[in-house]
């Protein structure tokens, strides 16, 4: 499993689809709070016709990626896009998360619930993110 550079995912006709926003995780509720706000904003912006979007954490917080994938699979979701809320593709996204995804896919396949899971590149690599950060830094330094 490798990180996909393209946001496009090929879906089988009639398949149910969802997205998981994946954050690193922390035991500090103050660190977690902005992710709940972000999820609410995305859901509101996408409206009722948007792709179902959930939040998961790689470690140190709940729901875990595994729990979220299993919940979605149990609800009949057959295609999941994972959008990492990371600044760059470090060790976690290059090694740890792909191993987690592969294990989840194998477990679900063995249980008779195959799910296609697509790992996308981290949002921090998107040009809009770099532009937004640059603008904030420039504003703060003026």
Q: What residue spans do the PLM features occupy?
A:
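Active-site-proximal alpha-helix that buttresses catalytic centers in soluble enzyme cores
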Residues: 1-142
């Amino acid at each position: 499993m490798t990180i996909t550079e393209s946001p496009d995912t090929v879906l089988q006709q009639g398949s149910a689809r969802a997205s998981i926003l994946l954050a690193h995780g922390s035991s500090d509720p103050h660190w977690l709070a902005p992710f709940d706000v972000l999820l609410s904003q995305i859901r509101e912006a996408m409206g009722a016709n948007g792709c179902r979007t959930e939040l998961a954490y790689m470690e140190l917080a709940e729901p875990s990626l595994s729990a979220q994938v299993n919940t979605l699979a149990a609800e009949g979701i057959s295609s999941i896009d994972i959008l990492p809320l990371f600044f760059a593709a470090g060790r976690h996204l290059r090694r740890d998360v792909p191993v987690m995804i592969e294990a989840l896919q194998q477990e679900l396949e063995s249980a008779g619930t195959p799910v296609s899971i697509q790992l996308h590149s981290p949002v921090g690599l998107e040009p809009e993110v770099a532009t937004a950060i640059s603008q904030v830094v420039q504003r703060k330094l003026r």
